Amino acid sequence: GVYLTNSLEEAHDFDNLPLFTQWLADESLAASEVKRQAPVMVVLGNPPYSGHSANKGEWMKHLLRGTDTSDHGALTGNYFAVDGKPLGERNPKWLNDDYVKFIRFAQWRIERTGHGVLAFVTNHGYLDNPTFRGMRQSLMQSFDEIYLLDLHGNSKKKEKTPTGGKDENVFDIQQGVAIGIFVRKPGVKRWTGDMAKVWNADLYGGRRDKYTTLNA
């Protein structure tokens, strides 16, 4: 089925609602069931990028910091720490960007199933910005294979091609873009210190050239 829901909000139960709102409650309950129990094996999309996130739910706030309040406070991947130690960032604002929250949600959902694929087109900031080193470590500990294609096109950084030529965005936005595919395999035993194998590539140039390469 197709459900209207806010993925970044914790799943809820609905009891004793007025009859005229029952249809909305039924849809919310169905969506909550998917969040909690359905064996979701593929999460894909192009989530919004917003450093000034309007999604300020407590569940996601704690999940980003390594605590799953939907599972009795169980410890989980912490984007605000590396090797168990706090990042110590003076301004960790960008870890609260909406696209980071959607990646964290998708990671959590695939972990609950035990295996699956996360495929997102997002802001490319998390690939190399030091603020995201806890996020990168968490993703590498959670998945077995990671495929990253940095499409660049960041006009804020005035990016150029390696030869000094013009580099354009694939969208009509200023922020650079990346494609990330994260694979968690079934039946794989994970030990402390295990990290995903990562494949990384860059794509520079004009928009049409990038489209041609992506369609090849």
What is the predicted function of each stretch?
Residues A54-E58, E89-R90, W108-A216:
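Sequence-level detector for compositionally biased, low-complexity segments
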